[in-house]
A protein has these predicted regions:
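Solvent-exposed soluble domains appended to multi-pass membrane proteins
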Residues: 259-267, 277-278, 283-614
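Transmembrane and membrane-interface helices of multi-pass
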Residues: 13-221
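Helix-boundary/low-complexity linker signature
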Residues: 34-45, 78, 270, 282-286, ...
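Methionine residue identity
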Residues: 1-6, 14, 18
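PLP-dependent class I/II
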Residues: 11-14, 279
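Membrane-interface segments at or immediately adjacent to transmembrane helices
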Residues: 198-275
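Membrane-interface micro-motifs in multi-pass membrane enzymes
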Residues: 124, 130-133, 219-229, 233, ...
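Hydrophobic N-terminal alpha-helices or hydrophobic patches in metabolic proteins across all domains
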Residues: 59-76, 82-87, 91-103, 108, ...
């Protein structure tokens, strides 16, 4: 019995020791695992820290394509840009699960955005904005005529980006998170990103944090806010909000006050109306001294002195260096870009159904309506928009025959011959003709040399791009003189309207500015001319803006005007000029008048056409 007791005690002792040994080993194993987990998270933390640096480099280098962000982007805005880049960077990482790939995508986006903005600024003098994405096709169609040679800054910044791109291979060793962690992180980062972008678009947030909010000066806005923050702020304006206090019935009541009755007598013997919106036609003397070996627009300058049956002056546009379609929009509709997002393109964004315009109105009076452009039909969506504006006959480059070229474009001389051919063909219809022609000859850029163009006009500046531009303007001036000479000999009553769509880009204009501080609105002035082969009241130095010009032309021509045009004529007495580039106030100007105009424009552009279609 005693032996059995001793054996039991020994067994219990041995089992106890075994349990203690197992417990010690388990504790040691748990400690080791805990240490490994701690070390793992430390390693992940280090990798995450280095990945967090990637968006910072991406932001500053992207800005360096255009300027020095450390000196010119406001401090608070720099932090907001970095935060925006961080959110995008982390979203890419959690979506892909790979630091190396995500960082390369982020750098690639920064390079693409930076280079695109640089060239848009170079060629158009305004920054890249969200709605430029709608214009990608048009931009591609004319890209071959611009000089894309990279400057020193671009080369250096791109080389640094390439070096960083190569270094991202170090991230291949970075650990990965489970899909559960990634999914939760995607949702969290997405919510923060949406909330932050929304905050950037709020006026109170912009004011509190000293963000520059004025779309009127987009280049400065981008410079002090940074590209990413400005782009996020601009997203709020992709769609046009209803004006405060807007009511469709109230807009209709307001227009009804300007309605006039049109009788059959009013529509008898209506004149042909020919409108030529000439590509980049301008007189750069408005920017500074400009001396040349011969007058670059002798005919226009002569007409500006006060010719019989002629109205001349300067018309203020809303665009500079590009976005031709916005000038078309203002002239044809009577609407102003001042009430639409900066850089937006109504042809591509807003005109999706029948829209009131000069063409549609003249068609209702019995006119045959023609839209002509000696280039690709798809440019600015014209082939789809023109019919919605009331044009029944469309001519694009494939419809032109036996033409001459200047550089790579159909010449203005051939284009104006096409106008004459259209007029002659239209006579058989017995209807007056409304011909709206948008030329192409003078389109930028102006840096390349061509076998079919010699720069005959030479200025005091050592700038061949400027000399080429002035030579092109001289050719246009000759073509215009020939056109008016032809119609001065025809019996049919005809009125010709001629104006430029905008001034050329900074490559040319900055030469004449010659470093001087030029009033902003002068950069948006182009000459215009209204001439007839019958009696109209002549005038010179009569300045206006494109939204008014069509109504003023109809009045000069003796053609009845509709309610909206009558309203514009009334408004022009207190606000002689309204464009996205600014306003000119007259006697009796009142901010309430602008608010009324904004409401009526919204009705014309977004509501009136819907009512007719219902």
């Amino acid at each position: 019995m005693e032996m059995e007791g001793m054996e039991g005690a020994i067994l219990i002792f041995m089992l106890g020791n075994m349990e203690q040994t197992v417990a010690r080993k388990q504790t040691k194993r748990e400690k080791n695992n805990a240490q490994k987990r701690t070390e793992g998270w430390k390693q992940k933390g280090i990798w995450l820290f280095w990945y967090a640096v990637v968006p910072v480099f991406a932001f500053y280098l992207m800005e360096c394509y255009e300027h020095n962000p450390f000196a010119e982007v406001r401090v608070g805005a720099q932090l907001f840009n970095i935060f925006l880049f961080e959110l995008i960077g982390w979203m890419l990482y959690f979506l892909t699960g790979r630091m190396c790939f995500a960082s390369r995508v982020l750098y690639g986006l920064a390079v693409a955005f930076g280079i695109t903005n640089h060239y848009v600024m170079k060629f158009r003098s305004t920054p890249f904005v969200p709605w430029d994405l709608f214009s990608a096709g048009t931009a591609a169609s004319v890209a071959g005529n611009y000089d894309f040679t990279p400057d020193r800054r671009m080369v250096i910044v791109t080389l640094v980006f390439i070096a960083l791109f190569v270094l991202t291979c170090l991230f291949k060793k970075a650990p990965r998170f489970s899909w559960k962690i990634r999914l939760g992180s995607i949702v969290l980062v997405g919510l923060v990103l949406c909330t932050f972008v929304n905050a950037l678009q709020q006026e109170s947030f912009q004011t509190k944090h000293y963000l520059y909010p004025f779309l009127f000066t987009p280049a400065y806005m981008t410079k002090v806010n940074g590209m990413a923050v400005t782009f996020a702020m601009d997203l709020a304006y992709v769609a046009v909000e209803r004006p405060a206090g807007y009511d469709a019935d109230e807009a209709k009541e307001t227009l009804a006050k300007y309605e006039t009755k049109t009788t059959e007598t009013d529509t008898q013997d209506l004149p042909n109306i020919i409108v030529i919106m000439d590509e980049a036609f301008s007189d750069l003397k408005v920017l500074g001294p400009l001396e040349t070996n011969e007058d670059y627009m002798p005919f226009m300058h002569r007409m500006q002195q006060g010719e019989k049956n002629t109205v001349t002056g300067y018309v203020q546009t809303s665009v500079c260096g590009g976005n031709t379609a916005d000038s078309e929009f203002e002239f044809l509709t009577g609407n102003t870009m001042a009430f639409l997002p900066n850089g937006s393109i109504p042809y591509q964004q807003y005109i999706k159904s029948r829209t009131p315009s000069l063409a549609g109105y003249l068609k209702s009076l019995g006119y045959a309506t023609y839209a002509q452009h000696p280039y690709q039909a798809s440019g600015w969506n014209r082939d789809k928009v023109y019919p919605l504006l009331g044009f029944d006959n469309l001519d694009f480059m494939e419809d032109y025959r036996d033409v001459s070229y200047v550089r790579n474009y159909i010449s203005d001389a051939s284009d104006m011959e096409h106008i004459i051919e259209t007029y002659e063909k239209n006579k058989a219809s017995g209807k007056p003709a409304f011909i709206f022609n948008v030329t192409m000859q003078n389109h930028g850029g102006y840096t390349d040399t061509y076998m079919n163009l010699t720069n005959d006009i030479q200025s005091q500046y050592a700038s061949e791009p400027l000399n080429q531009y002035l030579t092109l303007i001289h050719k246009t001036d000759q073509a215009l003189e020939n056109l008016i000479d032809y119609f001065s000999k025809v019996d049919d009553r005809t009125i010709i309207v001629f104006f430029g769509d905008h001034q050329p880009n900074d490559t040319v204009a900055s030469v004449v500015e010659n470093g001087a501080q030029v009033e902003t609105q002068k950069r948006y002035l182009v000459p215009y001319l209204v001439w007839s082969n019958y009696g109209i009241e002549g005038a010179k130095d009569k300045n206006t803006s494109l939204n008014y010009l069509a109504a003023q032309v109809l009045t000069a021509a003796g053609v009845p005007t509709n309610a909206y045009q009558n309203y514009l004529l009334s408004l022009s007495k207190t606000y002689p000029v309204i464009s996205a580039a600014g306003q000119t106030k007259g006697i009796g100007a009142d901010e309430k008048q602008l608010q009324t105009y904004k409401k009526l424009q919204y009705y014309q552009l977004f509501e009136k056409n819907k009512e007719k279609d219902e």
